[in-house]
């Protein structure tokens, strides 16, 4: 039972193998993966892979027993539109927590949920982590962690770090009410900032929500800020350059600047995003939905053009800006290590500041200070920013407050050295 031609990569059929579809030589696939790890390390980078602890392929029966699943009363009844003659009796609960025998076409009917009420499941999943860590994998992006007990992760992560202390764990956690739980109990190093920062940025771009909402999301995080992982795209979400989101790669620039420069959160880049990949192809199971399909064998147009050295002029512009901003965020000490002062509360709406479409903040480190203003409006703006003396005092700088005038392009951002 698969979705699309390739099937979901999150419907795990063997936790201890590499998909033959990813190998040049199917019979040599594990050796190829190990060589990839060595090449990556030689290049000074780390290898992070997905760990999918909540659900597996419905017909995965070589590692688990029936006690590792949730068994229901009665046979599985698949959606009629699938035309499947697959028989499963008793049915198992689906990966998205459907605890009845008739999942819908929108459910994860191709997966079954693992039973963490059974302690045996904990030990089996720990062995999966040990297997890949022993091969030199540096970290794990853990899928759908809120569907798995935080206590399991707290135990498993501590067990792995006892053997491999530098192993890194990222939590795909969506509900911001659970952020602290999966850091403090789950032991994760980084947490997706989905329902906070990402959802707010998307609402600003798509729904006209006020940029002032970003202040509340920032304040909500408190001491968790360095533990957050900002992103504008991932395999579940629509491409930011798609017609369903910002509409172009350039229109993403203010959100990119805020995601990279506002606080100390890390940032995740999804492949092709740096070229303004639009995800507007009809790709089988996924249909035309602004996403790059994970269910079918398909070409990502911008990636193909990049490999052939044929990027369009627009893609080169977007790529240059992503490269520049990523370099600033990681190599400029103000943004890599500095503190943040939010200027929104000192700047009420006026003729020269639209607090619903513009966002202003300062970053400071040692004796340097920088102003950043992002303009989410489709029109250029001449902006005046009020910087109070308290902002400079916050950074340990003795300087009077001032008003600064600057110009910001449509759907763009600007930076200004203040000290």
Give short role names for the model-derived ranges.
Residues 9-30, 58, 107-122, 137-147, ...:
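The substrate-binding groove and active-site-proximal loops of carbohydrate-active enzymes
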């Amino acid at each position: 039972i698969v979705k699309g031609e390739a099937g979901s990569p999150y419907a795990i059929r063997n936790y201890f193998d590499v998909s033959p579809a990813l190998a040049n030589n199917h019979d040599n696939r594990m050796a190829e993966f190990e060589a990839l790890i060595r090449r990556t390390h030689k290049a000074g980078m780390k290898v992070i892979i997905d760990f999918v602890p909540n659900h597996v392929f419905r017909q995965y029966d070589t590692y688990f027993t029936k006690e590792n699943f949730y068994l229901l009363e009665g046979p599985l009844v698949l959606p009629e539109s699938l035309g499947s003659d697959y028989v499963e009796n008793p049915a198992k609960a689906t990966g998205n927590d459907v605890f009845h025998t008739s999942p819908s076409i929108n459910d994860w009917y191709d997966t079954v949920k693992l039973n963490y009420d059974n302690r045996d499941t904990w030990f089996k999943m720990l062995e999966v982590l040990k297997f890949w860590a022993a091969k030199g994998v540096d970290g794990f992006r853990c899928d759908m962690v809120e569907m798995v007990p935080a206590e399991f992760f707290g135990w498993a992560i501590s067990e792995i770090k006892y053997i491999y202390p530098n192993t890194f764990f990222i939590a795909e956690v969506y509900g911001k009410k659970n952020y602290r739980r999966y850091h403090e109990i789950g032991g994760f190093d980084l947490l997706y900032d989905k329902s906070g920062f990402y959802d707010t940025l998307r609402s600003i771009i798509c729904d006209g929500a006020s940029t002032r909402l970003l202040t509340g999301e920032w304040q909500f995080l408190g001491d968790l800020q360095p533990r957050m992982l900002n992103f504008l795209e991932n395999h579940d979400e629509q491409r930011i350059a798609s017609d369903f989101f910002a509409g172009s790669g350039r229109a993403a620039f203010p959100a990119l600047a805020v995601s990279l420069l506002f606080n100390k959160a890390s940032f995740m880049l999804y492949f092709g995003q740096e070229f303004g990949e639009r995800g507007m192809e009809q790709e089988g199971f996924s249909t035309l939905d602004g996403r790059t399909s994970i269910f079918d064998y398909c070409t990502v147009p911008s990636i193909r053009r990049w490999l052939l050295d044929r990027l369009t002029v627009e893609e080169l512009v977007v790529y240059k800006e992503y490269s520049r901003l990523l370099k600033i965020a990681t190599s400029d000490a103000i943004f890599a290590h500095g503190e943040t002062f939010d200027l929104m509360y000192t700047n009420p709406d006026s003729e020269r500041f639209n607090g619903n479409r513009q966002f202003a903040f300062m970053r400071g480190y040692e004796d340097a200070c920088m102003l950043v203003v992002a303009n989410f409006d489709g029109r250029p703006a001449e902006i005046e920013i009020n910087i109070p003396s308290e902002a400079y005092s916050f950074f340990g700088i003795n300087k009077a407050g001032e008003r600064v005038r600057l110009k910001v392009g449509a759907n763009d951002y600007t930076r200004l050295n203040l000290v």
